[in-house]
């Protein structure tokens, strides 16, 4: 009988050992899965750090390229100024030599005239007249020949100088084109590198998502096993109830057998005593075995209840997170639409800038053609007619050029005002009336969330989800949560007030800055116009006073000045184009970051839905039992 009792007592113990081992294995699997999940989170953080490093490297390379281009432009400007200075000195020397030669010629003429006057006073009128006529004819012929040779030489020199200037201008344009091609190639290389990094990151993200899905499937399988174990615990509870009923029946039987009122015959009494002693020993063993089994079942029930409370807390937290992510997705989608619209506007502005650069290059070519056409005008035979017609043509050409420059200045000022107006309207349209602070899953933010805060808050929530909660800790948590909610409301009110004040200040500062810029540009354009008008008047005076000596000098200076103005315009347009490209690249990066966050939020929503479905499956047996 004792062996049978022992075998009966060892059977439930053997049944409970695999249940405990399965629970321990499940716990070990859950801890390993959580560790792997944390490792995957750290890998995602490292990928984000790599993206940030790639962005920093790209910005540094862009800064180096801009510095190198500015240095090359400064060197080119210095070389041009040196060449102009040397040319100016050569021209000054030639002018001084011409002035000395004309002074000598005039002195010789004065001496000759003085001699003729002396001869006339002496009384040889006819001879003097004939001699004077012959001398005058010879002198006029010699002067005409010398002037013709001098003019031909000057024409050749001017043609050579113009060829040199055109070659220098063509070299500059070629250098600018090569620089632009190098910059485009570098930009394309950077874009290819960015796309490659983006593809690698997307590949890693897909791989991580597949791993997370596999781990979700493992978690669902473990939850199913846990549901099976809860069913087994229910069976054990039913067995416990049956054993309790058997204990009650045994105790009633003991009371019935041990009552003194019952009288039995002597033979039957001895047998009853023997049977009673044996039954009493068996009942004591059964009671002890049942008490041990009941204690074990109670411990298992407590553990399962703790696990169910933890799973309920996790389910509530996940539901809360899913609602928060739904709320957070709306502003992110709206912001993505706004960024796409801004990208389209930036592309349109870049196209407009390129068209403007093409127009400026076409105007430069037209000016060159006009200069070449003006140089190929027909020469008149007489020197007086030639000087008069060239003066008139030069003045007319200068007036036309000033009018063209004035039209270009007006067009650029109108274009600038239009761009400023469109930027203001765009800024007002994009600026939200009030930036609401949203309590997101990643913290408190207006619209976007940083990656560092995302990782930190996710780690903190995971740590808080793991810890089991007692009733006293729940009370403390509720009080601390109420205090935190009050503080958060106060902080949000203060933050919104500061944000409104900052928006007002930014609007005031932006308006004054735009007005100051407009006034400054208007003053600069007026000063340029006055300077051009004064230069034209000076040129007209010089043309009237000196004739043809300073025409080609002024012509060359004017050409150099117009070329410098056009180069400055091209440089400004290139700077604006680079700025727009940088803004477009920043917008693209922000768009990619938003897409990555949307992917993360979708993954979290799917995980939350799966966990919520698993938690409902787990809670059904306990609800039935309760």
From Swiss-Prot:
Region Disordered, as annotated, extends over 452-480
Coiled-coil region list: 19-254, 284-413, 490-604
Q: Where is this region: Mediates association with microtubules?
A: 1-365
As for what it does, the entry says: Associates with microtubules and may play a role in the microtubule-dependent transport of the GABA-B receptor. May play a role in JAK1 signaling and regulate microtubule cytoskeleton rearrangements.
Q: Which PANTHER family match?
A: GOLGIN SUBFAMILY A MEMBER 4-LIKE ISOFORM X1, JANUS KINASE AND MICROTUBULE-INTERACTING PROTEIN 1
Subunit structure, interactors included: Homodimer. Forms a complex with GABBR1 and KIF5B/kinesin-1. Interacts with JAK1 and TYK2.
Q: State the name under which the record lists this protein.
A: Janus kinase and microtubule-interacting protein 1
Species: Bos taurus
Q: What is the lineage of its organism?
A: Eukaryota, Metazoa, Chordata, Craniata, Vertebrata
Q: Which gene is transcribed and translated to give this protein?
A: JAKMIP1
């Amino acid at each position: 009988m004792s062996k049978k009792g022992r075998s009966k007592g060892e059977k439930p113990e053997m049944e409970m050992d695999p249940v405990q081992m399965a629970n321990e294995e499940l716990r070990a699997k859950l801890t390993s899965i959580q560790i792997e999940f944390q490792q995957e989170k750290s890998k995602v953080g490292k990928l984000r750090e790599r993206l940030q490093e790639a962005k920093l490297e790209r910005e540094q390379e862009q800064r180096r390229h801009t510095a190198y281009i500015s240095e090359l432009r400064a060197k080119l400007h210095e070389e041009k100024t040196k060449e102009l200075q040397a040319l100016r000195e050569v021209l000054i020397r030639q002018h001084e030599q011409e002035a000395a030669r004309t002074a000598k010629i005039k002195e010789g003429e004065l001496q000759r005239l003085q001699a003729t006057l002396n001869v006339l006073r002496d009384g040889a009128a006819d001879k003097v007249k004939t001699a004077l006529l012959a001398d005058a004819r010879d002198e006029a012929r010699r002067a005409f020949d010398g002037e013709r040779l001098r003019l031909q030489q000057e024409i050749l020199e001017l043609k050579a100088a113009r060829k040199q200037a055109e070659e220098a201008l063509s070299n500059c344009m070629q250098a600018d084109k090569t620089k632009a091609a190098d910059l485009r190639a570098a930009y394309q290389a950077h874009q290819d590198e960015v796309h490659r990094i983006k593809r690698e990151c997307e590949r890693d993200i897909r791989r991580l998502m597949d791993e997370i899905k596999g781990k979700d499937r493992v978690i669902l399988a473990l939850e199913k096993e846990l549901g099976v174990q809860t069913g087994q615990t229910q069976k054990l509870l039913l067995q416990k109830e049956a054993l309790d009923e058997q204990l009650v029946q045994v105790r009633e039987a003991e009371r019935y057998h041990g009552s003194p009122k019952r009288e039995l015959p002597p033979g039957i009494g001895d047998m009853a005593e023997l049977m009673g002693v044996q039954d009493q020993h068996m009942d004591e063993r059964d009671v002890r075995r049942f008490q041990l089994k009941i204690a074990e079942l109670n411990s298992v029930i407590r553990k399962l209840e703790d696990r169910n409370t933890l799973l309920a807390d996790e389910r509530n937290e996940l539901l809360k997170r899913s609602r928060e992510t739904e709320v957070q997705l709306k502003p992110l989608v709206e912001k993505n639409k706004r960024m796409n619209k801004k990208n389209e506007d930036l592309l349109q502005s870049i196209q407009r800038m390129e068209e403007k650069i093409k127009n400026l290059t076409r105007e430069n070519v037209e000016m060159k053609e006009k200069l070449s056409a003006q140089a190929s005008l027909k020469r008149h035979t007489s020197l007086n007619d030639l000087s008069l017609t060239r003066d008139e043509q030069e003045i007319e050409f200068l007036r036309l050029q000033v009018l063209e420059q004035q039209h270009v200045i007006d067009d650029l000022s109108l274009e600038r005002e239009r761009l400023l107006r469109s930027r203001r309207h765009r800024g007002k349209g994009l600026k939200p009336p009030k930036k609401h602070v949203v309590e997101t899953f990643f913290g408190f933010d207006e619209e976007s969330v940083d990656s560092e805060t995302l990782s930190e808050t996710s780690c903190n929530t995971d740590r808080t989800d793991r810890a089991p909660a007692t009733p006293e800790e729940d009370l403390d948590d509720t009080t601390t949560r109420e205090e935190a909610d009050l503080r958060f409301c106060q902080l949000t009110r203060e933050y919104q007030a500061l944000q409104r004040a900052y928006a007002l200040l930014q609007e005031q500062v932006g308006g004054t800055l735009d007005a100051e810029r407009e006034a400054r540009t208007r003053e600069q354009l007026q000063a340029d116009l006055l300077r051009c008008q004064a230069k034209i008047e000076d040129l007209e005076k010089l043309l009237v006073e000196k004739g043809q000596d300073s025409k080609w000098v002024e012509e060359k200076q004017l050409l150099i000045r117009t070329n410098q103005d056009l180069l400055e315009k091209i440089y400004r347009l290139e700077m604006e184009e680079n700025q727009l490209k940088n803004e477009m690249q920043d917008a693209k990066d922000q768009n990619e970051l938003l897409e990555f966050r949307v992917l993360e939020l979708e993954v979290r929503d799917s995980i939350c839905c799966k966990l919520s479905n698993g938690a409902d499956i787990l809670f059904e047996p306990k609800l039935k039992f309760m």
